[in-house]
Amino acid sequence: MKRAQIDAFCGCRETLYQRIVFFAAPAILLAGIVYVAVRYAQLPAEIPSHYNFYGEIDGYGSRGTLWITPVIGILCDALMLAVSFFPQTWNVGTSVTVFNRALVYRRVRDLIADIRLSTAVMFTAIAVWQTALTPTFPWGMGVLIGVCCTAPLVRFFVRLAMKK
């Protein structure tokens, strides 16, 4: 579907926030790829690849494994972008009526944008952290991952409850 068709189907126009995220999420992922590419030649052939519960390194792998995280991030973003073009496939969790159609679809479009942005931040942060060769697992990374996983849902449900 084209954007105009999606807007007509949803009964609402794409917001400025959604347009910004449309470009910001891939830009963030690209920044992570550039960082890995710039640092790649300076890295040893074998790098830490796994950490135990105490944050100590307990596994090593090839530096080529650094590309896995950005590629997964790109695939996740591409999948979410593809889903955003087919609103009729969204499971919105409520009955969509003539009266609530615009609100429900606007909120779900925002949720998809939030998930794209959070996913891009999370995968880029992981790629940068892996490339930095930190000797222990930074526990702040766990907090970042937790926030990236829960913030879009919290924002969605709070805004849905407010019904603005």
Language-model features, listed with the residues they occupy:
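Cytoplasmic juxtamembrane regions at transmembrane-helix boundaries
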Residues: 86-110
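Interfacial helix-start motif at the membrane-water boundary
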Residues: 56-76, 108-113
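Short, Lys/Arg-rich, polar N-terminal cytosolic tail immediately upstream
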Residues: 1-14
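Select subsegments of transmembrane alpha-helices in polytopic membrane proteins
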Residues: 18-26, 79-83, 108-120
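Active-site and channel-lining beta-strand-loop segments
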Residues: 36-68
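Short, basic/aromatic recognition patches
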Residues: 16-44
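Alpha-helical transmembrane segments of multi-pass integral membrane proteins
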Residues: 121-164
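Membrane-water interface of transmembrane alpha-helices
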Residues: 39, 75-95, 154-164
